[in-house]
Amino acid sequence: MQHQDVAIIIPSRLSSTRLKQKPLQLIGSITLIERVFKQINQANLEHTYVATDSEEISNIIKKVRGKVIFTDSAIPTGTDRTYEAFKLIPNNQNINYIVNVQGDMPFIEPSSVLKIIEYLKNSEYDIVTPVVKVDRESVEASSNVTVAVDSAGKALYFSRSLIPNGAEEFLYHVGMYGFRKNALEKFVSLKPTFLEKTERLEQLRVLENGMTIGTCLVENVPISVDTEEDLKKAVKFYENISKLGL
């Protein structure tokens, strides 16, 4: 298998504020978390784990021969859960890169994960995250995060507002992060910052502390499931692609 020095970690906490037991919600006959895992597993990376506090989630993943790491339900964020899981990986001294994939993207493309890894390994950024070019109409129809970048693609700021103001094309931020090991260790040691708390975006803690985030372009905006309405959209999308035999 490729990229033996990379760990993919999918944090999946059973409790959810906006959608009850979100990872266990069905899309077709398969749970959300199983769909995410199966998509990511197509990248064919040996060190792929689901980090969870739930026996139910663990059983689902183990039935499809996935690897599970148990983490405390009190862990506050997905990044913290990712780090706690990383510390429990056997022989983790051989892992130099960690990719955090949110457990709410049931149709995420495995190529996006591989692109993050390649970009991270061939750059000097502390962290790499994917973005998609979208028009104003697309981004206004959602509650998504946009990012402003410099000419080299280095992230300057992330916001829940449309940035840059007045533009007609934006960079939609996809919720995946590739960390160098030392960058992940540094991140979890830092306290939440003013901008992070104001925007409710963890990645601003990185920028406020002088660390760097590189962006890599991917083609498609993945469906994220956070609410009942999102779940309905995901089910509808699945039904449509099933009819097409995809």
Swiss-Prot record:
InterPro entries: Cytidylyl_trans, KdsB, Nucleotide-diphossugar_trans. Activates KDO (a required 8-carbon sugar) for incorporation into bacterial lipopolysaccharide in Gram-negative bacteria. This is 3-deoxy-manno-octulosonate cytidylyltransferase. Pfam families: CTP_transf_3 (PF02348). Keywords: Cytoplasm, Lipopolysaccharide biosynthesis, Nucleotidyltransferase, Transferase. It is found in: Cytoplasm. One of its GO terms (cellular component) is cytosol. It comes from the Bacteria. It comes from Rickettsia akari (strain Hartford). One of its GO terms (biological process) is lipopolysaccharide biosynthetic process. Its main location: cytoplasm. One of its GO terms (molecular function) is 3-deoxy-manno-octulosonate cytidylyltransferase activity. It is an enzyme of class 2 (transferase). Belongs to the KdsB family. Pathway: Nucleotide-sugar biosynthesis; CMP-3-deoxy-D-manno-octulosonate biosynthesis; CMP-3-deoxy-D-manno-octulosonate from 3-deoxy-D-manno-octulosonate and CTP: step 1/1; Bacterial outer membrane biogenesis; lipopolysaccharide biosynthesis. It catalyses: 3-deoxy-alpha-D-manno-oct-2-ulosonate + CTP = CMP-3-deoxy-beta-D-manno-octulosonate + diphosphate. Its EC number is 2.7.7.38.
